[in-house]
């Protein structure tokens, strides 16, 4: 075996400092997702807005209510159940994962 000649510390430092290699990728500097704070409670004003808009809609899901009014999906589901009990919307289709409602005014037309 051939013995390697050891480089001095100065040569190693110069070699490391020279820009021959590409800069190392820094991990963790990627895009950061914006945190959206969703409402957990529903005020009477918001419920009145939802009641007005949902009554005219042909199809309503909990995702539509949650994204439009910035509500948690569970809260949106509770709002739709409440409106269904009031008679503003009517359940059209439902299974264990998703429930689809339709506004009562939209069904009459």
From Swiss-Prot:
Domain of life of the native organism: Eukaryota
InterPro entries assigned to the protein according to its UniProt record, in alphabetical order: Ribosomal_eS25
Similarity annotation: Belongs to the eukaryotic ribosomal protein eS25 family.
Keyword annotations of the record: Ribonucleoprotein, Ribosomal protein
Biased composition (Basic and acidic residues): 1-13
Pfam family, one: Ribosomal_S25
Region (Disordered): 1-34
Gene3D superfamilies associated with the record: 3.30.63.20
GO cellular component terms listed in the entry, alphabetical order: ribonucleoprotein complex; ribosome
Designated name of the protein: Small ribosomal subunit protein eS25
